[in-house]
């Protein structure tokens, strides 16, 4: 009988980690707000590291401010830095939303961030006037870097945004809230595409599609200050409390749906990322349940195209091939189910996160695929390297961080997730939805053919 075999970590040291710290997830979330600006309350490196990572992956600049704490802040605190930082941002950039993202240093110091924000609001009102100051919303996001990971930081940020900005009204707005998780601009656009085909108006918490894949064209908006096009408008964030329901497409982003449900009696569904046929079917059914809108022929046609593509290649090139998957826990579970749908064997799944959601989800995949799956939960790429040397596979699926391991082991690597920095265009190419599944079918098959398609067989295929 198929089962999930969880392999426990045998060392305390982390070698080549798969996850990073909480603030990255919070900065990503705030960057998806129209005229939104993250302000990192920490040292310069806390923002520089993330900006560098975003620039490598998205090939776009990221506007992230920092209070630039130094050694003296460890003794005297960062009050002056945060208050002046908020004031400077408000005066120079005039953002709609400023997200104050805490870090290791500010959390360990014990800075009264909430108190500093109140003082900063008073100072901003003195300089800019009450009316202008009231238009700028400040969201406090606690993300201590010494615990958890970027996915927890993202979850904390989305909850803080909702709790701070949502304003209940007497009537529903007829909109559906979607929390996409940490995904690429191409995935966000695919989510909006599916909602559009069903005639559903959605509120993305948050929409990073244009901010991280912005068109290079003259802006019609005020050029001083200049903001990237797109993002979730402040009005939509305030209107969240009046929506039909909330669907989170990442199991780690469950705090905001729970908060909205508790405060406003709003139905919610926390699920896996809609990767592959089964997961996308589930997403479409949930949207239909929440809105009452029918599934259109256009969506059924897109689904049919993927099924046809799978039938073309699965039995011929993919069936029975063993796969190692690593990275974002929500994406890895979705990818494990999808490769099983292709007739492949998800031999091992490795992620830097461990919680009951992912364990239970992967158990379901093992049962559905009738295959034993080895799971490296809460581990790193070193653990995966050791495993693969003893248990070889035919394909690796994950981020660019595993490229050297794949090269050393002679295993082809199909790149998904974050970060991908040694190839271009992956941030624009969806893996979510039926169109994303089609990209995966083609990409996985071509990666297999590049490695295992023998030259002596070429004439037979002509």
Swiss-Prot record:
[8Fe-7S] cluster binds at residues 21, 46, 104, 145. One of its GO terms (molecular function) is ATP binding. GO terms for biological process: nitrogen fixation. It catalyses: N2 + 8 reduced [2Fe-2S]-[ferredoxin] + 16 ATP + 16 H2O = H2 + 8 oxidized [2Fe-2S]-[ferredoxin] + 2 NH4(+) + 16 ADP + 16 phosphate + 6 H(+). Its EC number is 1.18.6.1. Its cofactor is [8Fe-7S] cluster. It is an enzyme of class 1 (oxidoreductase). PROSITE patterns: NITROGENASE_1_1, NITROGENASE_1_2. Pfam families: Oxidored_nitro (PF00148). Gene3D superfamilies: Nitrogenase molybdenum iron protein domain (3.40.50.1980), Nitrogenase Molybdenum-iron Protein, subunit B, domain 4 (1.20.89.10). Belongs to the NifD/NifK/NifE/NifN family. This molybdenum-iron protein is part of the nitrogenase complex that catalyzes the key enzymatic reactions in nitrogen fixation. Tetramer of two alpha and two beta chains. Forms complex with the iron protein (nitrogenase component 2). This is Nitrogenase molybdenum-iron protein beta chain. The lineage of its organism: Archaea, Methanobacteriati, Methanobacteriota, Methanomada group, Methanococci. The gene is nifK.
């Amino acid at each position: 009988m198929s089962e999930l075999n969880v392999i426990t970590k045998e060392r305390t040291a982390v070698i080549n980690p798969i996850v990073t710290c909480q603030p990255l997830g919070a900065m990503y979330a705030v960057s998806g707000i129209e005229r939104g600006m993250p302000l990192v309350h920490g040292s310069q490196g806390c923002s520089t590291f993330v900006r560098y990572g975003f620039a490598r992956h998205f090939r776009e600049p990221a506007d992230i401010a920092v209070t630039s704490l130094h050694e003296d802040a460890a003794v005297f605190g960062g009050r002056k830095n945060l208050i002046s930082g908020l004031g400077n941002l408000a005066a120079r950039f005039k953002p709609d939303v400023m997200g104050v993202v805490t870090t290791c240093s500010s959390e360990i110091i014990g800075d009264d961030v909430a108190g500093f924000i109140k003082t900063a609001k008073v100072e901003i009102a003195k300089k800019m006037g009450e009316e202008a100051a009231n238009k700028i919303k400040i969201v406090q996001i606690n993300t201590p870097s010494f615990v958890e990971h970027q996915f927890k930081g993202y979850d904390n940020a989305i909850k803080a945004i909702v709790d701070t900005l949502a304003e209940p009204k007497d009537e529903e707005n007829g909109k559906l809230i979607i929390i996409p998780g940490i995904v690429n601009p191409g995935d966000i656009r695919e989510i909006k595409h599916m909602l559009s085909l069903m005639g559903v108006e959605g509120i993305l918490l948050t929409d990073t599609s244009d901010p991280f894949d912005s068109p290079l064209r003259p802006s019609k908006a005020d050029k001083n200050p200049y903001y990237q096009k797109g993002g979730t408008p402040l009005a939509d964030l305030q209107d969240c409390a009046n929506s039909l329901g909330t669907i989170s497409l990442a199991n780690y982003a469950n705090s905001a749906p729970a908060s909205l449900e508790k405060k406003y009696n709003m139905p919610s569904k926390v699920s896996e990322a809609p990767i592959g046929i089964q997961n996308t079917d589930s997403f479409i059914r949930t949207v239909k349940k929440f809105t009452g809108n029918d599934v259109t022929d256009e969506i059924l046609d897109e689904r049919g195209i993927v099924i046809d593509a799978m039938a073309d290649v699965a039995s011929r090139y993919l069936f029975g091939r063993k796969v190692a998957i690593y990275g974002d826990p929500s994406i890895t579970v979705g990818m494990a189910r999808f490769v099983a749908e292709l007739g492949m064997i998800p031999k091992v799944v490795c992620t830097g996160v461990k919680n009951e959601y992912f364990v239970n989800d992967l158990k379901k995949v093992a049962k559905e695929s009738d295959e034993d799956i080895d799971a490296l939960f809460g581990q790193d790429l070193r653990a995966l390297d050791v495993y693969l040397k003893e248990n070889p596979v035919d394909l690796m699926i994950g981020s660019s961080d595993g490229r050297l391991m794949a090269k050393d082991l002679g295993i082809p690597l199909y790149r998904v997730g974050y970060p991908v920095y040694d190839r271009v265009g992956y941030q624009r190419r969806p893996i979510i939805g039926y169109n994303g599944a089609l990209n995966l079918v083609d990409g996985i098959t071509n990666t297999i053919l590049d490695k295992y398609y023998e030259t002596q067989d070429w004439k037979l295929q002509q």
